[in-house]
């Protein structure tokens, strides 16, 4: 028993129990096209750690044992893993709903030009992070021109049906800088 388990038992008088697994979140690596100051995994373009296909096969084995579970792919920029598309297709073949957490600007990187079409054709759900709704704040946190590229990507995703069709949800995650929310 680890220290966390001991502390939980001291407070609750029993261990933690879980209900059925509904979502499996999988981090495909720390490679990212951005260098965000607020990144909790410290992903950057300089990082080289990525999930291998061998490890992805273990993920597929786990996912197969959990039919109906949503698989949430994250990173870094998960799209930059060279096995990203093969994993998405394998998960869909198993009948899983696939959700990808994207920074939007990755679609402008070399080799990523058709990624939005790839995702839309497969009905992959998207969760897009945008640290603010103001261009200055986004560019300060993520780099010059990131806000404009993000908006361009959102328009492209909308043109493919994302955020417009029930089968192609596009959720935006707002990341405030600090312990506060924007004014109402």
Question: Which residues are covered by each model-predicted region?
Answer:
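Hydrophobic, aromatic-enriched interface-forming segments
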Residues: 167-184
């Amino acid at each position: 028993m680890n220290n966390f388990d001991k502390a939980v038992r001291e407070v609750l008088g029993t261990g933690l129990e879980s209900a059925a697994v509904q979502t499996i979140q999988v981090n495909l690596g720390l490679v990212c096209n951005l260098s965000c100051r607020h990144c909790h995994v410290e992903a950057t373009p300089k990082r080289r750690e990525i999930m291998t296909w061998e490890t992805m096969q273990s993920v597929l084995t786990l996912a197969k044992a959990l039919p109906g579970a949503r698989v949430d792919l994250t990173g870094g920029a998960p799209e930059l893993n060279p096995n990203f598309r093969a994993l998405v297709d394998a998960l869909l073949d198993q009948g899983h709903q696939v959700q990808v957490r994207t920074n939007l600007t990755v679609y402008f990187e070399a080799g990523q030009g058709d990624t939005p079409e790839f995702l839309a054709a497969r009905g992959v759900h998207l969760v897009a992070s945008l640290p603010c709704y103001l261009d200055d704040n986004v560019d300060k946190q993520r780099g010059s021109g990131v806000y404009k590229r993000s908006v361009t990507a959102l328009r492209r995703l909308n043109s493919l049906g994302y955020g417009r069709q029930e089968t192609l949800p596009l959720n935006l995650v707002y990341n405030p800088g600090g312990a506060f929310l924007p004014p109402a």
